[in-house]
Structures are given as C-alpha cells and as structure tokens.
C-alpha cells in the first residue's frame, strides 16, 4: 500500500507475519480514523489469513438492548447497565454473521469441521445471528443439514418404516393378501406400535428439553434477539450434547461468553483462518449513543480489559473518538492493571505531520486536475515558502482541518483576483496576505475545537472519579 494513502500507524496495526493482535486508536473527528480502519480491513482481507469483521453501526444491537431492558429513549444514559457479557454477545453476533457470508463464498471451509463442530457452529449462528439482512433462517437451515450425520437420518427413517409396517400387519392379515401366522400378528403389531410410540416420546422429550434450554439461553441475552423457533428447531434436531455449548449452569454470564468466544475462534481456526480480527469504528456516529461521552464510555469501558484484548486468536481494534481518552489517561492504578494497554498497540492521538498532509493534498490535486499533474507548492506565490505551508498544516494536524484550511485559503485568494487577470500571470498563485489571514482563522478554530473537546474529556474524568 502506498505510504501516502494511510497514516504511519498502519504498519503497527497490520502485522501480516503474526497472528491477530488488539489495538486502541484515539482520534478526533476528521483525523482519518475511518480511512485508517478501511485501509487496515483492506490489508487484512487481501492477506486472507484471518476472518475480518467490521462493526461500524452499533445501533441495531443497542436498539435490541433498549427494548429488552424496557428503557425509554429519553432516559439519561440508558446504556450504563451494559456489561462485558453484553458486548461479547455483540462481538459474537457480528462475527457469526460475517462468518455466514464467508462460508457462502467459500463453502469448502465448512467441510473441514467435524459433525459435532458443525453442530456447535449451527447453534452459535441460530443464537447470535441478528438477521439484519433477513438471511438467518437460510444459514441455519444450511448448517443444520450439514451438521446432522446422514446415517442418523437414514436410521431414523428405517426405524419409522419398520414401526409403521408392524402396525399395518393386522390390516394386511385381514385383507388376506399376505399369510402370517395368527399367533405372531398381535406381537408384531405391538412391537411396531411400541417403536412408533418410542419415536413420538423421544421427539416430545427433545422438544420439551429444547424449550427449556431455549428459555434459559434467551433469558441471558440482552443485546441480541435469537429466533426462538429456529433455536428450538436446532436444539431438537442436533445431538443432545449440543445444548451445553451455549449454557453451563456452574459458570457466570461473563465466563460463559468468554467460553463461547474462544469456541468460535477455535472453529474459525479449524476452518483455515488464523483467528478473528474485529474492527469497531464510528461509535460517535451512533444515533442512540448521541456522541455523548458518558454513553460512549459505558459502551467501550467494559471492552478495555486485558483478558479480552489479549485473548488468543482475537484481534480487537477499537477506533475511538478522542473524547474518550480519559478512559486511559485518567485511569487509576487498578483500572490500568485491568486494561494492560502496554501489551496492546495504543495510538493515543491520531495526528498527521505537515509533510504527510502535504502529500495528501498533492494527491487530491492530481485526482481533481484535468490537465498536467500539479502540486500544492506550484500554487504558492514567490513570497510564500512551502515550509510555511507545512508548518500551518502541521499545526492543524488532521486531514479535515487541513483541507478546510486549504479550501478557505483558495476561496479567499480567488475573491481578490481581478476579472481581467491574464491566464499566464503569476497573480493566480496564492498570496501571503490570504495565507496569513486563513492561517490565523484556521488556527483559532482548531484551538477552540480542541479546547471544547478537552473540557468534555475533563468533565468525563471528573464524573468517573
């Protein structure tokens, strides 16, 4: 990937020679977090070693949580009750949906799993697929057909045919079409009826057990909404040992979610991937979190935990708004020990140098130019040095602020140009006067914006302390 296209931290986030790794990236709006996330995802997908999952819209899951909790949308920070188990559920949901898409494109990977592993995967998909695209039933049905051993279906069919045949013996005897010893007619019919009754009793017992397991599973899920009918169907059809995959009585919710996440990662590995890469971005664009620091903090804080960030086979990459930096900078000793971000990649502020922003600007000029390729330096007047332009861009530090400054600069300069200016005149070049005016105005706006963000962050830290 070209060096100009992404932030220098790209190389720290994409280690194609190692396994999945976690990272926490803070940046203000317009700093290029989403562009960096897209570049990281593109690099990981091109490498193909890991299953890459992007979560850029958390509202569908948060809406489920609000409904499950019975909270009104007007309640202040209705997400304070989110815990780590809920957020691992969200990860499992996003991962199972992405895995279903990947298996559609590469169905051969499913053949690498044993029948018991396919049954485990089927239950995970039935429980965690959020059905945002309406394809949950199709995926569960496909996995059910692939998870049930063919010999069991054949054996069940033969058992049913033999039972039905035994029950029909008296009718056949009365019709006189087949000669059967009268003394054997009743025992054969009773055996046939017993076989059918046994099948019916077994089916009823499996259905009741499935309903019981389904109720226990659904009661623990607050951020996903499993389809009860599909879950009962899966629990009824799959082997009896499959149900404990989802719930075990002796463990807490959080322990159970860690076990399920580790189980999914192992399934992913057994299908040929090195692990799971999960990229979370744009939480400040959530309509439910409303870009409120307290709501976003309630959503992210449970995830900043050493056990989760360092989970083997999981690369959790969080692209977070800079307002949440007090979660790290203002953390006390106990919280720092819990997070252990020294063992993960941490970008505490996504900033760009003047040279990097200049390269981005030059690339935009090339893309927008109909004539010969040009660069920003060629548009500056003789009294204006390129070093000064780099310094101005460096002070702004983000693509959004830098490009806003350049836009205002060219607009200001264009307003001063005379109508009769000759095409070949040097007057077209940006003057120092326009540069100084817009540099001062842009610097003031940037300082005001960052001061407001710092105040918001301080308020967050004060409330938490």
Predicted feature locations:
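C-terminal alpha-helical "lid" subdomain
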Residues: 130-143, 147, 155-160, 188-192, ...
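The catalytic "switch" region of P-loop NTPases
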Residues: 3, 28, 44, 212-386
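Hydrophobic anchor at the beta1->P-loop junction of P-loop NTPases
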Residues: 25
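Amphipathic alpha-helical scaffolding segments
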Residues: 39-45, 52, 295-301, 408-411, ...
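Pre-Walker A adenine-sensing motif
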Residues: 2-20
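P-loop NTPase nucleotide-binding core
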Residues: 31, 35-270, 446-450, 463
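Conserved GTP-binding G-domain of TRAFAC-class P-loop NTPases and closely related GTPase folds
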Residues: 78, 82-102, 351-396, 401-409
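Short beta-alpha junction loops
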Residues: 57-61, 320-324, 417
């Amino acid at each position: 990937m070209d060096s100009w296209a992404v932030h220098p931290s790209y190389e720290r986030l994409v280690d194609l020679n190692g396994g999945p790794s976690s990272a926490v990236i803070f940046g203000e709006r317009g700093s290029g977090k989403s562009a960096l996330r897209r570049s990281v995802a593109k690099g990981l997908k091109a490498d193909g070693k890991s299953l890459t999952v992007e979560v850029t819209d958390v509202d569908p899951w948060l809406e489920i949580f609000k409904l499950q909790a019975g909270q009104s949308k007007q309640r202040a920070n209705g997400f304070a009750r989110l815990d780590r188990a809920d957020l691992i559920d969200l990860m499992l949901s996003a991962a199972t949906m992405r895995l279903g898409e990947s298996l559609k494109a590469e169905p051969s990977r499913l053949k690498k799993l044993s029948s018991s592993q396919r049954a485990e995967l089927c239950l995970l998909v039935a429980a965690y697929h959020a059905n945002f695209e309406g394809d949950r039933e199709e995926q569960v049905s496909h996995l059910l057909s692939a998870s049930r051993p063919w010999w069991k279906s054949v054996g069940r069919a033969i058992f049913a045919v033999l039972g039905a045949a035994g029950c029909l013996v008296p009718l056949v005897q009365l019709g006189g079409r087949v000669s059967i010893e009268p003394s054997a007619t009743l025992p054969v019919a009773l055996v046939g009826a017993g076989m059918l009754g046994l099948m019916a009793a077994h089916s009823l017992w499996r259905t009741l057990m499935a309903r019981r397991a389904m109720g226990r599973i659904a009661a623990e899920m607050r951020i996903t909404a499993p389809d009860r009918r599909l879950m009962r169907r899966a629990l009824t059809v799959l082997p009896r040992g499959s149900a404990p995959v989802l719930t075990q009585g002796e463990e807490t919710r959080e322990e159970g979610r860690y076990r399920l996440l580790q189980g999914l990662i192992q399934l992913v590995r057994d299908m040929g991937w090195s692990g799971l890469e999960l990229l979370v971005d744009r939480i400040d664009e959530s309509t439910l979190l409303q870009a409120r620091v307290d709501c976003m903090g309630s959503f992210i804080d449970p995830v900043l935990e050493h056990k989760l960030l360092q989970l083997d086979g999981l690369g959790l990459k969080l692209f977070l708004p800079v307002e949440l930096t007090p979660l790290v900078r203002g953390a006390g000793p106990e919280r720092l020990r819990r997070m252990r971000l020294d063992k993960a990649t941490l970008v505490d502020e996504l900033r760009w140098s003047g040279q990097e922003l200049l390269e981005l600007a030059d690339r935009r000029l090339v893309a927008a130019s109909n004539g010969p390729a040009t660069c920003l330096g060629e548009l500056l007047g003789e009294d204006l040095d390129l070093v000064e332009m780099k310094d101005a861009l460096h002070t702004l530090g983000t693509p959004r602020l830098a490009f806003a400054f350049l836009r205002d600069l060219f607009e200001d300069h264009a307003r001063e140009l005379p109508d009769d200016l000759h095409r070949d005149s040097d007057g077209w070049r940006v003057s120092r006067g326009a540069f100084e005016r817009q540099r001062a105005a842009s610097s003031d706006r940037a300082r005001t914006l960052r001061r407001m963000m710092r105040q918001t962050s301080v308020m967050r830290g004060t409330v938490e302390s």
